[in-house]
C-alpha cells in the first residue's frame, strides 16, 4: 500500500518523462485489449449460462436489440356483470356469479337420475326464465335467469322442456335436473341442450364424453365421482355451490354465447369506432402518445404501455385478436363506466354492442380450430417483439394454445422472426421519412444532378475526346490549327494533302 501512495505522489514527475508516458499508453492499450479478448473468449458467457441454466427468462432475445415479450390479459373484471364459465373436467362445469361474489352455479353431466330424491317436482314454466318454484336461494336468480335464457331459449327457440324437474324444499338450495333423453316437440331437445352448453363452455367435445356416479346426502348436497367412460349423458344437474376457484375461467365462452345469433347468420358489420386512447401517468393525468393497460387488466403487476404505432395498426387492420381484445377494454373503460348503468342494463348494452366491437369470424375460426385440435387463440396471452433501445413494439399476436397449454416459442419462430424484420423495416422507413422531411428539396435536386454530372464527366474522361489534328510523323503542331488538307491559315504549314490524324489534348 505504501508503494502505491509513493507512486501517486511521484506521478507528476513520472509523466514528465516521455518514456514513462509511452509505457503508460502501452499498458492501458494492453489492459483494454486483454479485457476485450477475455470477453470474446467465452469464459464469461459460459459462467453466465451455467448460472442461469434451467431458470425462467424474462424474455427471449432475438438479436442485440429485439426481445420477444408477452402480455397476459385479465379479462375477468371486464365482464363483472356476466357469469363466467369454466370446466374442471368433462363433467363438472361452473358459472361464477357477477361482481366478485363468492357463490356460483355447478352444472354436472351424469347418467344417474335424481327422480327418486325427495321433494322433486316438475318445473311449472320455463318461459322467460320463470323458475319461481325452484329458485329458493334468493341470490342466484340473475345468473340462473341468464343461464336459462342463453342456454335454453336463445339457442333452442323453445319455451319449455318436458324433462325438467327441480327441488322445491324451502332453504334446501337450488337443484334442477334436465332429462336429456326426453324429446320435445322440436325433436331431440336434450341433445341440442348439451350442444348449447358446449358452446358456452368452449369445448364441444367435453359435453359428450364420460359419466359420473352421484352420492346425495339427506341435506340435499350431491357429490359426483368416477367421471370417466365413453357414453352419452342422460341428465344435466344444476345446483348452487360456493365459489372456491374450482377452475380457471375465461369470459371468451360468454362472448361466444353472446355472438351466437350473429355467428350463424350472414351479417356484415363495421367497426363501431376508432381508438381514442392515450397514455396516463401514475396520477391518472392523460399524456398523449399511446395507450397503457391498467394494472387490473394484466395478470402481472405494473403498467404495460403500447405506442401510437401499435394502436394505428389496430385502427387499420381489424382482423387481429389483440385489437378485438383492446376494443373490449376500451368499451369497458368508457361506455359502461361513463353511463353508470345497473347490472341488467350493462349486460344488455354489452350484448348489443359486442358484435360491433369484435370480429365474430375470428371467434368462430378459433372455436373451429379448438374443435379440430389445431392451435387456437383464447384471447388471453399475446406475444410481441420489443425494441429494447427505442421502446417500440410490434403489433401483438395471439399466443396460440393446444390441449390446454401454450405453445413453445420454437413452434412459431418464423412468425416472431418476421415481426422482428418488419420492426427493423418500419424503423428504417421512419428514419428515411424523417431525413426527407428535414432536407430541402432543392438541395436534394442539386445533389442528384451533381452526381449525374460527375458520373458523366468520368465517362467522358475515360472515352477521351480528340481535340486537334497532328501531322503523321511530326510533333504537336500547336498553337497552329491544321485543316483537313494539312494546311494552316497563317502559312506555316504550306504542303497540302499530307496525312493527318486526330489526337487528344496533351498527346
Swiss-Prot record:
Cystine connections: 86-247, 292-305, 314-323, 377-398
Alphabetized InterPro entries for the sequence: Arena_glycoprot, Arena_glycoprot_zinc-bd
Lipid attachment, kind N-myristoyl glycine: 2
Marked site (Important for GP-C-mediated membrane fusion) residue numbers: 33
UniProt cross-references to HAMAP family, sorted A to Z: ARENA_GPC
Pfam families, per the entry: Arena_glycoprot (PF00798)
Cytoplasmic face of the membrane: 34-58, 467-507
Protein name: Pre-glycoprotein polyprotein GP complex
Record family assignment: Belongs to the arenaviridae GPC protein family.
Site residues, Cleavage: 58-59, 272-273
Residues that, per the record, bind Zn(2+) 2: 468, 470, 476
Organism from which the protein derives: Allpahuayo mammarenavirus (isolate Rat/Peru/CLHP-2472/1997) (ALLV)
GO cellular component: host cell endoplasmic reticulum membrane; host cell Golgi membrane; host cell plasma membrane; membrane; viral envelope; virion membrane
Intervals, Extracellular compartment: 2-17, 59-445
Molecular function as annotated in GO: metal ion binding
A GO biological process held by the record: fusion of virus membrane with host endosome membrane
Keyword Membrane: yes
Amino-acid positions noted as binding Zn(2+) 1 in the UniProt annotation, renumbered to this chain: 57, 480, 488, 490
Sequence intervals crossing the membrane: 18-33, 446-466
Keyword vocabulary terms for this entry: Disulfide bond, Fusion of virus membrane with host endosomal membrane, Fusion of virus membrane with host membrane, Glycoprotein, Host cell membrane, Host endoplasmic reticulum, Host Golgi apparatus, Host membrane, Host-virus interaction, Lipoprotein, Membrane, Metal-binding, Myristate, Transmembrane, Transmembrane helix, Viral attachment to host cell, Viral envelope protein, Viral penetration into host cytoplasm, Virion, Virus endocytosis by host, Virus entry into host cell, Zinc
Residues of this chain annotated as glycosylated in UniProt: 89, 111, 179, 240, 378, 386, 403, 408
Amino acid at each position: 500500500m505504501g508503494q502505491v501512495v509513493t507512486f501517486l505522489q511521484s506521478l507528476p514527475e513520472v509523466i514528465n518523462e516521455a518514456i514513462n508516458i509511452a509505457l503508460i499508453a502501452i499498458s492501458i492499450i494492453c489492459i483494454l485489449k486483454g479485457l476485450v479478448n477475455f470477453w470474446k473468449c467465452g469464459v464469461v458467457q459460459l459462467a453466465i449460462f451455467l448460472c442461469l441454466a434451467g431458470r425462467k427468462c424474462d424474455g427471449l432475445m432475438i438479436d442485440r436489440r429485439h426481445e420477444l415479450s408477452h402480455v397476459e390479459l385479465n379479462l375477468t373484471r371486464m365482464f363483472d356483470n356476466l357469469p363466467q364459465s369454466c370446466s374442471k373436467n368433462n363433467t363438472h362445469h361452473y358459472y361464477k356469479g357477477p361482481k366478485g361474489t363468492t357463490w356460483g352455479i355447478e352444472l354436472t353431466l351424469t347418467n344417474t337420475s335424481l327422480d327418486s330424491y325427495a321433494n322433486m317436482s316438475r318445473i311449472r314454466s320455463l318461459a322467460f326464465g320463470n323458475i319461481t318454484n325452484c329458485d329458493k336461494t334468493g341470490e342466484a336468480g340473475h345468473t340462473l335467469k341468464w343461464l336459462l335464457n342463453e342456454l335454453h331459449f336463445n339457442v333452442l327457440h323453445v319455451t319449455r322442456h318436458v324433462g325438467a324437474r327441480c327441488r322445491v324444499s324451502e332453504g334446501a338450495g337450488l337443484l334442477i335436473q334436465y332429462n336429456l333423453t326426453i324429446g320435445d316437440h322440436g325433436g331431440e331437445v336434450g341433445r341440442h341442450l348439451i350442444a348449447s352448453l358446449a358452446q358456452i363452455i368452449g369445448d364441444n367435445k367435453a359435453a359428450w364424453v364420460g359419466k359420473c356416479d352421484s352420492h346425495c346426502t339427506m341435506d340435499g348436497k350431491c357429490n359426483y365421482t368416477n367421471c370417466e367412460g365413453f357414453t352419452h349423458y342422460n341428465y344435466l344437474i344444476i345446483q348452487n355451490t360456493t365459489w372456491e376457484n374450482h377452475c380457471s375461467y375465461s369470459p371468451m365462452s360468454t362472448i361466444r354465447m353472446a355472438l351466437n345469433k350473429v355467428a350463424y347468420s350472414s351479417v356484415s358489420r363495421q367497426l363501431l369506432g376508432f381508438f381514442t386512447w392515450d397514455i396516463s401517468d401514475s396520477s391518472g393525468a392523460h399524456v398523449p402518445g399511446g395507450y397503457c393497460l391498467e394494472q387490473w387488466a394484466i395478470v402481472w403487476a405494473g403498467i404495460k404501455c403500447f405506442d401510437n404505432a401499435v394502436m394505428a395498426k389496430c385502427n387499420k387492420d381489424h382482423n387481429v385478436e389483440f385489437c378485438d381484445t383492446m376494443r373490449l377494454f376500451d368499451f369497458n373503460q368508457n361506455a359502461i363506466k361513463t353511463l353508470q348503468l345497473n347490472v341488467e342494463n350493462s349486460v344488455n348494452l354489452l350484448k348489443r354492442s359486442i358484435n360491433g366491437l369484435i370480429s365474430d369470424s375470428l371467434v368462430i375460426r378459433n372455436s373451429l380450430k379448438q374443435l379440430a385440435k389445431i392451435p387456437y387463440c383464447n384471447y388471453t396471452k399475446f406475444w410481441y417483439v420489443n425494441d429494447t433501445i427505442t421502446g417500440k413494439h410490434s403489433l401483438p399476436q395471439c399466443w396460440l394454445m393446444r390441449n390446454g397449454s401454450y405453445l413453445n416459442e420454437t413452434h412459431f419462430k418464423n412468425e416472431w422472426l418476421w415481426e422482428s424484420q418488419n420492426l427493423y423495416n418500419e424503423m428504417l422507413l421512419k428514419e428515411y421519412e424523417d431525413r426527407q422531411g428535414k432536407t430541402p428539396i432543392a438541395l436534394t435536386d442539386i445533389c442528384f444532378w451533381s452526381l449525374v454530372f460527375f458520373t458523366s464527366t468520368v465517362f467522358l474522361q475515360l472515352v477521351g475526346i480528340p481535340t486537334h489534328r497532328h501531322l503523321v510523323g511530326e510533333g504537336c503542331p500547336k498553337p497552329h490549327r491544321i485543316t483537313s488538307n494539312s494546311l494552316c491559315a497563317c502559312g506555316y504549314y504550306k504542303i497540302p494533302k499530307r496525312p493527318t490524324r486526330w489526337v487528344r489534348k496533351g498527346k
